[in-house]
C-alpha cells in the first residue's frame, strides 16, 4: 500500500499536545513538523530515524515501484535539493546547472520527470508564479514547498535555514489545507510571498519571522502597499505584538492565521 503523509495542522498539533495557541507552541510546531507519530517519540535520534523511514518509504519504495526511475540516487538528491531550496524561486534549468556544476550529467527531461514524481507523491508542492498586474501565470521560475517541515528539521538540519523559511512553508501548507489555490506573486519588480485564491476571494500574504525593525516592516509591507487593488492584504509574522493596520495592509500573528482564512 502506498504511504501518504498525513500532515497535522497547527490546530491539530495544539489538540494533540494539549497546548494553548501562541508564540511558544507555534515555534515548537515549526520545529517538530506535522507528522503526528513524531510527537510521541522519546529521543531526537528516534525522531530522525522515523522521518528518514517516511522519506525512504515514499521515495525509494512507492515512487521507484510505480515510475520508470533509472537513477535512484538522483531522485534522492533532487529531493534533498528541494528540501534545501524550499521557498526559493528557481527553474528546472537551475537544478540541471546545479548538478552539472557537481559533474553530474542530468538531462532536463529526466529532472523534470523526477520532480513530477516527487510532486505526485505529495512530498513537495510546486507553486507557479502569478503576475498580479497582468493577472496571469508566468512560466519559468517557480517555488517548491515541502509537505512536511520535519524533512528539513530532522534530515538536513546543517544548512542555514532560518525560522522565516519554516514559517513561509507552514503558511503555504495552511492555505492549501483550507482549499486555497496558492501562487507566488510578482508585481512590477517586487515579490509577494503568496497570492491565495478561493472562490471569489483573493488574499495577498507576506510571511516574515519578525517585524521588529522599521527596515523589515518597510521591506515586507512595500510590495503589498504598491498593489493598487482592493483585495485583502496581510503580513504574517511571529511577533508577540499585534501591529496596527498600515494603509489597508493588516498584520496577523502566525498562530491566529486560521481565523482570517
Language-model region placement:
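Short, small-residue-biased leader/transition segments that mark boundaries at the very start
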Residues: 3-5
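Active-site ExK catalytic segment of metal-dependent nucleases
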Residues: 200-212, 220
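Hydrophobic/aromatic beta-strand patches that form the interior of the parallel beta-sheet core
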Residues: 145, 205, 234-236, 250-252
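Nucleic-acid nuclease catalytic cores
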Residues: 187, 228-247
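Domain-level recognition of nuclease-like catalytic cores that cleave nucleotide substrates
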Residues: 239-261
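Accessory nucleic acid-recognition modules appended to NTPase machines
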Residues: 43-202
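Short, charged, amphipathic alpha-helix that recurs within catalytic cores of restriction-modification
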Residues: 216-232
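Amphipathic alpha-helical "lid/sensor" segments that cap RecA-like P-loop NTPase cores
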Residues: 17-57, 68
Amino acid at each position: 500500500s502506498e504511504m501518504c503523509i498525513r500532515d497535522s495542522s497547527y490546530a491539530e498539533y495544539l489538540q494533540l499536545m494539549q497546548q494553548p495557541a501562541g508564540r511558544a507552541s507555534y515555534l515548537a510546531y515549526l520545529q517538530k513538523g506535522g507528522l503526528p507519530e513524531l510527537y510521541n517519540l522519546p529521543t531526537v535520534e528516534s525522531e530522525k530515524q522515523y522521518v528518514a523511514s517516511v522519506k525512504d518509504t515514499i521515495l525509494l519504495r512507492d515512487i521507484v515501484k510505480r515510475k520508470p526511475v533509472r537513477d535512484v540516487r538522483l531522485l534522492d538528491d533532487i529531493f534533498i535539493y528541494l528540501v534545501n531550496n524550499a521557498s526559493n524561486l528557481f527553474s528546472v534549468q537551475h537544478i540541471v546547472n546545479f548538478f552539472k556544476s557537481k559533474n553530474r550529467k542530468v538531462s532536463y527531461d529526466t529532472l523534470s520527470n523526477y520532480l513530477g514524481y516527487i510532486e505526485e507523491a505529495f512530498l513537495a508542492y510546486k507553486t507557479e508564479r502569478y503576475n498580479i498586474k497582468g493577472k496571469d501565470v508566468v512560466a519559468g521560475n517557480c517555488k517548491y514547498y515541502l509537505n512536511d517541515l520535519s524533512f528539513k528539521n530532522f534530515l538536513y538540519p546543517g544548512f542555514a535555514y532560518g525560522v522565516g523559511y519554516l514559517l513561509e512553508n507552514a503558511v503555504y501548507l495552511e492555505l492549501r489545507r483550507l482549499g486555497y489555490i496558492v501562487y507566488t506573486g510578482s508585481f512590477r519588480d517586487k515579490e509577494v510571498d503568496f497570492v491565495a485564491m478561493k472562490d471569489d476571494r483573493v488574499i495577498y500574504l507576506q510571511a516574515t519571522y519578525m517585524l521588529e525593525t522599521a527596515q523589515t516592516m518597510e521591506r515586507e509591507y512595500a510590495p503589498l502597499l504598491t498593489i493598487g487593488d482592493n483585495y485583502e492584504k496581510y503580513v504574517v509574522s511571529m511577533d508577540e505584538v499585534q501591529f496596527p493596520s498600515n494603509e489597508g495592509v493588516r498584520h496577523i500573528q502566525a498562530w491566529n492565521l486560521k481565523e482570517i482564512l
